[in-house]
Amino acid sequence: DLLNRLTIKNLKLNKKRSIVTTIGILLSVALITAVATMVTSFRESLIEYEKKSNGNYEYVFYDVPESEISFLKNNRSIKDLYLVSGLGYAKIESQNEAKPYAYVVSMDKNAMENLGLNLVEGKVPTNESEIVIPTSVKTNGRLDYKVGDYITLDIGQRQSEGYNLNQNNPYDIDTKEEIINTKTKTYKIVGIVKRMDLEPYTAPGYTFITYSENGSKLNDVYVYLTNKGLKN
């Protein structure tokens, strides 16, 4: 009580200074609150941008056999998962010598919605006979495919001297390589998308994306964890 009385007495004796001090405190609190709000808002904006650009997932498991996907689906720490399967390479008439292929990838609906598939034109594939292509096919490969066109691809495994090659193996003009075990498939181009983050800049194939509900023999599985899973 004594301290309170002394404080009130001092405030009354120094009204002007007290008013200035009070205003200063209010302004400081307002400034701190504004800065905290800006930081939080900026952080949320960065998170949303990253989700939209590169995908809304936390972990990825590569080359998961089809028979093991059910174990991931039933894992209580996993809130959601998305399936991506590399179907193979097909030779196209690209004008970029370092990128002579289409690399055909299938995605399930969840993957298309959560892995940064940004449409420029058209729509996403809804069946296994539809496909979307990246803008870089035209800007980099000088191929003028349009939405509504049909494209026939001989899709197979890229190989050199008996070794299987993937998107992390750049195309070497001086090295002999071939596409083996090809299967011919005709697709309707239903959309054009921005280049996806899952395609390395040095990749030899432009990523063409088709639809698949259940994946294939080997899948890259992108997972989004529960809060409990994140803590563990």
Positions of predicted regions on the chain:
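Basic-flanked hydrophobic alpha-helices used for secretion and membrane insertion
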Residues: 40-232
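N-terminal Sec/SRP start-transfer signal
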Residues: 1-33
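Transmembrane alpha-helix boundary/anchor motif
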Residues: 33, 37-41
